[in-house]
């Protein structure tokens, strides 16, 4: 009689634009996963070491490229760590702008997640709905920085510039008719704050559409309910954070438990799951988008009523005004030295953790008093989640593997660094 043996299957890696360069070596008993061995490091770019050879203000651009779908949230933790080292005060208006863009980034991340997860499980329509909404938020990125993704907008001491009084306009092209461009430009006639007033109303309707497509969909629930279950206690032991932890029923969110910036002045709830499965993680992220929408609305209302500076007046870290730089040699020299040599910080070490869309993103900086960090270490939320891959996949069918990987929501830019 023939002897039956388990066999090994290489799952991935795929292109970074797909699910990322994860290589899983699966041991299968028929269609059942017996063991999963994740291999990481295929997108390692040496970001931490690169940052140790550059002045503090020249490494902000690297942060955007860590988790490249949550760009400004990466910048946020980094600039807050520098501010903590320098004991730098940030203007109140800049704090509200940062929080507003951090919540926009959370929505961008979760929309991409639900779009990709939908495709993995056969729901193509969700992808189209989600990307339609993401375009509006990318327009906001473009309006403040000129870039649709890698903005480098957050700066130590505040943000690069105040909110614009006009939004980018669509133009007639061979792909966009004059009539369509006019319709798209209707909410873009005023300032960014006017545009966001329109957005928060329309976004609720867009979320309702996605909700209708997925939440009670029989096939969606069959693919996600009781799949990849993690208990609350086990999630804490594994070092889960973010929606992975809250999906298991643990109400841990750094915006509430360790408030930073102006989150303590804003009203929002922490959505949690009950069962810790893929379906609960989906529900948590959907609810988080609604909470982020509320936070954006509160920030818009405050910013409209409270004009003011958006960058610290500490000339050690803040560049001169552009007009002054063009008319005054001393200001030009100041600008040149600031962006070529940077600035020195006090000796010491700091850690700053922020509530990233994927979990706790942390930046640890050890300074020896120079103009560049002696050591820079980043805590990627996805690393702990990938480390639990064997436990999450074991006992499930091979067809459940894409569902579990999707609901982890891992991007290897920050895991591999």
Curated annotation (Swiss-Prot):
Its EC number is 7.1.1.-. Keywords: Cell inner membrane, Cell membrane, Membrane, NAD, Quinone, Translocase, Transport, Ubiquinone. InterPro entries: NADH_Q_OxRdtase_suD, NADH_UbQ_OxRdtase_49kDa_CS, NDH1_su_D/H, NiFe-Hase_large. Its main location: membrane. It is found in: Cell inner membrane. GO terms for cellular component: plasma membrane. It catalyses: a quinone + NADH + 5 H(+)(in) = a quinol + NAD(+) + 4 H(+)(out). It is a peripheral membrane protein. It comes from the Bacteria. One of its GO terms (molecular function) is NADH:ubiquinone reductase (non-electrogenic) activity. NDH-1 is composed of 14 different subunits. Subunits NuoB, C, D, E, F, and G constitute the peripheral sector of the complex. NDH-1 shuttles electrons from NADH, via FMN and iron-sulfur (Fe-S) centers, to quinones in the respiratory chain. The immediate electron acceptor for the enzyme in this species is believed to be ubiquinone. Couples the redox reaction to proton translocation (for every two electrons transferred, four hydrogen ions are translocated across the cytoplasmic membrane), and thus conserves the redox energy in a proton gradient. Belongs to the complex I 49 kDa subunit family. This is NADH-quinone oxidoreductase subunit D. It comes from Francisella tularensis subsp. tularensis (strain WY96-3418). The lineage of its organism: Bacteria, Pseudomonadati, Pseudomonadota, Gammaproteobacteria, Thiotrichales.
